Amino acid sequence: MARHWRAGAVGMAVLGLTLTACGGAKVGDDSAGGSGSSGKCGTFNLAVNPWVGYEADAAVVAYVAEHDLGCKVTKKDLKEEIAWQGFGTGEVDAVIENWGHDDLKKKYITDQKTAAEAGQTGNKGLIGWYVPPWLAKAHPDITDWNNLDKYASKFKTSESGGKGQLLDGDPSYVTNDEALVKNLKLDFKVVYAGSETALIQAFRNAEKNKEWVIGYFYEPQWFMSEVPLVKVKLPEYKAGCDADAEKVACDYPVYNLDKIVSAKFAKSGSPAYDLVKNFTWTNDDQNTVAKYIAVDKMSPEAAAKKWVEANRGKVDAWIK
């Protein structure tokens, strides 16, 4: 889900890795290990970024690491840049769903050499502006950004200062939306819902009650199977059109989501590293596990167990 660090928040974390993303474990806290012995795997420190798709990735990787490889897995709930800082301290071994972040790759892989790439996850990531299905059906032209100002007054809220509201999610997700609104000269204001859960609920209510909502959203996302949001066409993305964050006036690219590990972990010989490197699945796979967690209210471990037992062939290919 849109996953870039907002520039203004980075400074909060530069003095240490004690902040958390979702009220989860602080770095340094241990979660329970698996049923297997730690064996040659030892401790595997896995960052968990604050969206349910990532939580699904982490649940499955942690389950396999614990139950098949005998690792002691420590999950650490962290926002993105904070997790990358942990590569250099040894407090984070892996980030298993990275959305682009060329800036962080340059800083931590190229310059500091504390991190390394570990291949793609197999997931294709989309970010954009979406409206509920009822709205796209009632006003088909609303899915073209050129027509948004015509409807701006319909999207006004008490928080949007007389303009149309463009709803974003977790404030830690870096989006291009404020720059897009400005550079496309739209009569809208970006307002943050506060979390992925709040964003989903806003779209769910909008579809149920025929409310006017337009907002930032992303795929893969299990919620799309419940409410198939319709993407608004923004000016076409072309390589380099988003190079200057303040001048962005184009759509988001398609992201080939990938995995990042600490340089030390990559050279450790740990079977957990091989698991991370070999881990790959589809958007449908992720959405299935995410739905178990978010909708069916299963624990991450129970959700992972259910998926692993139904997809043993895929799992065996990761640990062969």
Where are these regions (language model features)?
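Bacterial signal peptide processing site
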Residues: 23-26
